[in-house]
Swiss-Prot record:
PROSITE patterns: HEAT_REPEAT (PS50077), LISH (PS50896)
GO biological process: intracellular cholesterol transport
Keyword Repeat: yes
Biased amino acid composition, Gly residues: 148-163
The protein's name: RAB11-binding protein RELCH
Keyword field contains Phosphoprotein: yes
């Protein structure tokens, strides 16, 4: 042992707790385990330095015994291995130790070593092979080595009394087959029936060994459990402790269970049985019949009555409460001294010692009051000078200074510096956010945190402190930005700093100590958690220690090194670890002030800005936002802003740029330098154009609302920010005549949409009634659906205004002003009505109505705008401007011009963005009437139907509007004009997708059947695409049969034989819906009828009509060629139809004929392969070559086609 100890301790002391590489950690753990095994071999086997079997430099025989014949080779080897006198001890391998144990038959010690190695994951082959071989445990003759003659003391060797070797139990017996867990269960004791006593003794020895190990395990678990129960405090109770300063210490789980047990015992003893039963039910997780259920290794205390009687025998010192608004004059203090010496008899107690103790307490209180008076006078003097300075500089005096909540166990009573409440017990205006002229003593108390004042220590202790300890405890002041953000908005903005104190460690980090005494207390709390975990990647446990030391250390170089360790503590910190580090950095910043934050923390961030690991760069980005409130204002708007700008432009990790955006948002909540406005705008545009969706989302949630708040304060929201975005949209539309950049349009428009809440808040705050908005009486409730759901708390209008109550009052006055008094003198609202809305409507008219994405974006924008500004504003300000432009009247129909405004995107955006904002009956009627008028006017003027189609597509995406759309279409079905009926028939196709089958069956099918028998052929033909869509989307058998019969009548009725347009529409519909329709419908109806149409087209005389039909047949066959077609169908219909089509193309379009020949050849090859009856999935080499050659020719010919791409759009369409 003496030889081993230095090695063990030296290696243990060489572990670097700040080492971040996991491989090095594994090596250290492995080395530690190996040394532990060696030490356990000596210590666990009952050796001591004075025993005959101990391993000492004086005993050259390392692992032998005094009774064993000496082996020179072994003895010298062991002596060299374990070290001799004056020599450096050499490292002994575990395999050599195992070999020696097995050689000397110390089998239980070898078994224990084997078990330890298995638990550490390093199995030794020698021990594994030995204990897995049952033959090693058969009966043997003779005396085992290391076993002297009976009665010789001290002959146990390594397997002495501590090891409890079974071989010593019988004085000379042999060890039976009980060497390992794997062979113990299969031990056959019946084989040794010749000596029952020896067998019993050996069995007892083995069981005793296992029992001893089990007892040690149980004892260790009990100790750990008791320790955890004594120290851990639930999070909720810690929160209650923080909010209830009168509670001296939070209750622990162990204490709670013990008190529950005593209370229940008291109730039972005093016959409160029903109360006891109820109490037990409410604490069903505890067994009240067994004290051991409360806590292991804990003695049961006396009952409640005994505790109460015993409490009466103790003196309880009252709390020392000091009215900080009062003081003690020196002459009064001097007069108190003789009074103390002449105390009245009522204060005397029978014990002189207690009398002297009371005198000593009073003297200490006098000293305390003197010191408090001295400190307050010093504070008054300093505050007077600061007030004079601030008055000269025309600055407002901050009523409250940021401070950290002090540790609760360090104060006699809790103050409320953080919340701004005055601790004076005589004050009655606590918590009111009003302007109060503080007295000098009040200002001193509200500015200096209680734990920072020198009166926390008696005068005798202060006099013994070094000067630095007192001078270092100065009030920490932070630069307050000259901003007007509401507290709710400010709090919501800071919520994006990802810090955490909702854990034991987070609680320790957030309340780092600032005095010598509290450092020691904190070390006592944290060290028990650090020691067992620091080698198991729990290095965040070190954060409180590092921060406390960095906060209080007098040497700048050492502080810099500690902060460097903090930022490099974890190689790749995860989300929780980063939050813990950020929490510590903020606590550090609150204590040390802005100067040290700039000088000590920011350089650490700068060093990591280009680190190779994104987790480190993420920590830098998050820390910039978290530290923003604690930095000098000049640094916020210069260095930190530049750091974040660099990371936004250069960093390739999406997560890092997302954190940069959130930190930029926090910076925008504190920056007050107007010169940085345009730099912020450029950063905003860069963030909006970021390729990562995460970054763009963070921009809308944090950066944009914070920047808008600053813009509002500068007066630039309407005059610059919104106008600039509108101008960029207009420029995009002017330049995008040949191809609009829809991504940029979405970028700018979504930014405008995110600015709507800020714009509405500005309108409310600058309204004529804003000065009347006072909270008094009952506050009206805001409807839950009054505003659209915000993307983040910063886009909530109530957050921007300050509170939901204040917003409710403003909304009530807002609606009244719009209804009764108008907008005269209301500049911010007049700007919206007279400038913003006309410009937006003009932009809407320039959008391509066929761009579904653009129509949808502008529709959502107007919907949010109208919902935010309210129903009265929408009805009186928005709708009239649209109606003035659209002018829906049948008298104004211009058949030549097509009533141009109705063909633009203004129609769908007005219908879906404005008229759908509110869903009352009158609103729905207005929407139905508008769509009916548009459908009528477009039909009668022979104008394009794109605007109406866009409206139906946008509304049809929401099932809530399906009934409304069918109402509009039924109006068209029964209209007197065939043009309107034809338009209604075509609109059915757009409404069917996503519609329920029940609605299709009850409302759509009857309307289509009515139109299919219309006197006008054009109306009948217009129903064919809708019938095809039903075949594609519906699975109801009866409905499909009705549609099939209607289509069959179109194809087989003689009156339609010469209807070229009808045949063209049917072929186009078959090509569109065939691949997606039901297979039976496709095989039995579509393909056979296409074959018939191809045959009839061969007889067509007019070449133009023949080519038209052939072209549509080619597209239909190309789409159907990708579907599975049975052999019979291929032979009887598909191939004959292709051959008929090839006949047409030979004369009319030779380039199509080549492709058709390749398709026919490939289909024939498929049929031939099936007739050969080859195994499924296999194909001959020749067939494979032919197929590849066919594909190549087909693709080459496709590339040489001169026809439009639209004709071949469905060539490679697969069946869905």
């Amino acid at each position: 042992m003496a030889a081993m100890a230095p090695g063990g301790s030296g290696s243990g002391g060489g572990v670097n707790p700040f080492l971040s590489d996991s491989d090095e950690d594994d090596d250290e753990v492995a080395a530690t385990e190996e040394r532990r095994a060696v030490l356990r071999l000596g210590a666990g086997s009952g050796l001591d330095p004075g025993s005959a079997g101990s391993l000492s430099p004086q005993d050259p025989v390392a692992l032998g015994s005094s009774a064993r014949p000496g082996l020179p080779g072994e003895a010298s080897a062991a002596a060299v291995a374990l070290g001799g006198t004056g020599e450096t001890p050499a490292r002994l391998s575990i395999d050599a130790i195992a070999a020696q144990l097995l050689r000397d038959q110390y089998l239980l010690t070898a078994l224990e070593l084997h078990t330890e190695l298995l638990e550490s994951g390093r199995e030794l082959p020698r021990l594994r092979d030995y204990f897995s071989n049952p033959g090693n445990f058969e009966r043997q003759s003779g005396t085992p080595p290391g076993m002297g003659a009976p009665g010789v003391p001290g002959a146990a060797g390594v397997g002495g009394a501590g090891g409890r070797e079974p071989s010593t139990a019988s004085g000379g017996g042999q060890l039976n087959r009980a060497g390992s867990i794997s062979t113990l269960d299969s031990l056959d004791f019946a084989r040794y029936s010749d000596d029952g006593n020896r067998e019993t003794d050996e069995k007892v020895a083995v069981l005793e060994f296992e029992l001893r190990k089990a007892k040690e395990t149980i004892q260790a678990l009990r100790a750990n459990l008791t320790k955890a129960a004594e120290h851990e405090v639930p999070l909720q109770e810690r929160k209650n402790y923080k909010s209830s300063p009168e509670i001296q210490e939070p209750i622990k789980p162990l204490e709670k269970r013990a008190l529950n047990f005593l209370v229940n015992e008291f109730l039972l003893k005093n016959n409160y049985k029903l109360t006891s039963i109820t109490f037990s039910d409410e604490n069903d997780d505890q067994d009240f019949e067994l004290w051991d259920d409360v806590g292991l290794n804990i003695p049961k205390p006396p009952d409640l009555l005994q505790l109460y009687r015993d409490f009466g025998n103790h003196q309880v010192t009252g709390k020392d409460l000091v009215d900080v608004a009062s003081g003690v004059e020196e002459d009064e203090l001097e007069a108190l001294t003789p009074i103390i010496s002449n105390l009245p008899p009522t204060l005397e107690t029978p014990q002189p010692a207690e009398n002297s103790m009371l005198v000593q307490k009073l003297e200490d209180k006098i000293s305390l009051l003197n010191s408090e008076k001295w400190s307050l006078m010093e504070q008054i003097r300093r505050l007077k000078s600061e007030m004079d300075f601030l008055k000269n500089e025309h600055f407002a005096i901050p009523a409250v200074c940021d401070s950290v909540q002090p540790p609760l166990d360090q104060l006699p009573h809790k103050d409320s510096e953080d919340s701004g409440q005055h601790p004076d017990v005589n004050s009655s205006d606590k918590g009111k956010n009003t302007d109060i002229h503080l007295s000098i003593s009040d200002e001193a108390d509200s500015t200096i945190p209680k734990e920072n004042s020198p009166n926390s220590f008696p005068r005798r202790e202060r006099e013994g402190m070094p000067p630095s300890s007192l001078s270092s405890k100065k009030t920490v002041h932070f630069d307050k930005p000259n901003r007007k953000l509401s507290p709710a908005f400010h709090q919501a903005l800071l919520s994006f700093c990802r810090m955490s104190a909702d854990s034991r460690l987070g609680y320790e980090v957030s309340r780092i100590a600032d005095s010598e005494k509290s450092v020691m207390l904190m070390l006592g709390r944290c060290l028990p958690h650090i020691v067992p975990n620091v080698l198991l990647a729990k290095r965040e446990e070190l954060i409180p220690l590092i921060l406390c030391t960095a906060c209080l250390h007098p040497e700048p170089k050492e502080r810099d090194q500690l902060l460097h360790i903090l930022f490099n503590l974890i190689k790749r910190p995860d989300d929780e670890q980063r939050q813990m580090i950020l929490t510590g950095c903020v606590a550090f910043a609150r204590h040390v002030g802005p100067t040290r934050v700039e000088a000590e923390l920011l350089p650490q961030c700068w060093e990591q800005i280009n680190h190779k690991y994104p987790e480190r760069r993420l920590l830098v980005a998050e820390s910039c936002g978290a530290l923003a409130p604690y930095l000098p204002k000049e640094i916020r708007s210069s260095l930190v802003l530049s750091m974040l700008q660099q990371m936004l432009m250069e960093d390739k990790a999406d997560l890092v740029r997302e954190a940069v955006i959130k930190s930029l948002g926090i910076i925008m909540g504190y920056i007050d330098d107007p010169d940085k406005y345009h730099q912020g705008f450029e950063l905003l545009l860069s963030a909006l154009g970021d390729p990562s969706e995460r970054v763009v989302s963070a921009t809308h949630q944090v950066f944009l609302p914070a920047y808008a708040a600053w813009t509002t304060e500068l007066g630039n929201l309407q005059s610059h920010l919104i106008l600039t975005l509108l101008n960029k949209i207009e420029k995009l539309l002017r330049e995008g005549e040949h191809g609009l950049d829809e991504h940029k349009l979405h970028m700018y428009l979504s930014a405008l949409q995110s600015l709507i809440p800020s714009l509405f808040a500005l309108v409310l705050q600058n309204a004529p009634f804003s000065s009347k908005a006072k909270l008094h009486g009952e506050v009206p409730q805001i409807e839950v659906t009054r505003f659209p759901r915000p993307m983040s708390p910063l886009q909530d209008v109530s957050t921007i205004i300050g509170s939901r109550e204040q917003l409710a009052v403003l909304l009530q006055l807002y609606d009244y002003q719009l209804e009764q008094e108008g907008t005269t003198g209301w500049e911010s609202l007049l700007w919206v009505v007279n400038q913003l809305l006309p410009q937006l409507i003009e932009i809407v008219g320039k959008i391509n109505v066929t761009s579904t994405a653009c129509v949808h974006e502008f529709s959502r924008f107007f919907w949010r705008l109208c919902r935010t500004f309210g129903k009265i504003f929408t009805n009186t300000k928005v709708k009239p401007q649209f109606q003035e432009i659209l002018r829906l009247s049948e008298e104004n129909i211009d058949s030549s011009a097509g009533n141009g405004v109705l063909t633009k995107a203004t129609v769908p955006i007005y219908a879906t963005g404005v008229l759908t904002c509110y869903i009352q009956e009158e609103d729905r009627k207005l929407l139905v009437g508008f769509l009916e008028d548009v459908m009528t006017l477009l039909s009668l003027s022979h104008a394009p139907l794109d605007s109406l189609k866009a409206s139906f597509v946008e509304l049809g995406a929401n099932p809530a509007y399906h009934e409304l759309l069918l109402t509009v279409l039924w109006y068209g079905v029964v209209h007197t004009s065939a043009l309107v009926r034809c338009t209604a028939a075509r609109m059915f196709e757009l409404t069917l997708r996503g519609m329920s089958e029940a609605l299709v069956d009850k409302r759509v099918a009857p309307a289509l059947v009515t139109l299919s028998s219309d006197p006008e052929f054009s109306v009948r033909i217009a129903t064919i695409p809708a019938f095809g869509t039903i075949m594609e989307t519906v699975i109801q058998r009866e409905l499909l049969e009705r549609v099939k019969m209607q289509l069959a009548s179109f194809l087989e009725d003689p009156q339609y034989q010469d209807q070229h347009s009808l045949h063209t529409e049917i072929i186009k519909t078959f090509g569109r819906v065939g691949p997606n329709a039901e297979p039976r419908f496709r095989d039995e109806f579509v393909i056979p009828h296409l074959h018939k149409l191809a045959l009839v087209n061969n007889l067509q005389i007019v070449d133009s009509k023949r080519l038209d039909i052939a072209t549509h047949l080619f597209e239909a066959y190309s789409a159907l060629s990708c579907c599975f077609i049975s052999e019979d169908l291929m032979v009887n219909h598909f191939l004959p139809g292709l051959r008929c089509l090839r006949t047409d193309m030979e004369h009319l379009s030779p380039e199509h004929e080549v492709i058709l020949s390749s398709m026919i050849k490939e289909c024939e090859q498929k049929v031939e392969n099936k007739t050969v009856q080859e195994p499924q999935g296999s194909m001959s080499i020749a067939a494979s070559l032919v197929s590849e050659d066919t594909k190549t020719k087909f693709l080459n010919k496709m590339g040489q086609l001169t026809t439009s791409g639209a004709m071949l759009a469905n060539v490679f369409q697969r069946k869905k």
